Amino acid sequence: MHFHLPKPLHGWREFAGEVGIIVIGVLIALGFEAIVADWQWHEKSKAAVDALRPELAANFLYASEMAIAVPCVDQQLANLEDRVASSGAELNPAPQYSEAIYARYTYRAPSREWPDQVWDAMIVEGVTSHLDPALRRRLARAYNLLSMNRATNHGTDAIAYRLQLLARPVPLDPTSRNHLIEEIEEARGDFDDMKLRSEQALRMIDLSGLAPAQRDVDAALAVSGTVKFCRAHGIALGKAEPRS
């Protein structure tokens, strides 16, 4: 039995030309679709970065505040530690302060939320994979540092509440004295860590080209409760020095 392939009406040469035209048309359509998709992601990425600016600006201000305030915070904690160590059988009470937003405290330190909602949304929506690779790496590094600061800051907030006890003339035995000193030392170490991470985050945000203007940073620091407290009590502040 013999099979015969059907012949195109106008011959194989013309048929091949028609098929070629169709293939080229499909390739052009696919290429145009890819160009449109790339343009859409470019526009979406640009809009997302614009939406990210306020969140990054807030974190940049918080990191600057933390870096500047930590030397003052450490001095306050060192004074409290000396008070615990030098007290007799009863704690010599530390001064207690209060403000509109804080009912009472024995030392003043930054307490921030270190927001990341916009960045998380960019990850969920797949926008970050379409960012410039260098920008993506820097932002990811910055937000990783900020995330660690958030967790640590929650911990120092809890210690601050517990150290309100230092404003009372509570009995001290060797165990309770050592425990209080350990709490204070933990807070000092945590603030040192946050200072380092803050300065590293400052560098990443700065390198990303998304840092706020210096005048905005200065204006925010001028109204920082911790900075104002340190200046009012003559306790030295530090500097915000971006580092690797």
Q: Which residues does each PLM region occupy?
A:
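Long, hydrophobic alpha-helical segments that serve as membrane-spanning/inserting helices
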Residues: 1-13, 34-244
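Hydrophobic membrane-insertion alpha-helices, especially the h-region
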Residues: 18-32
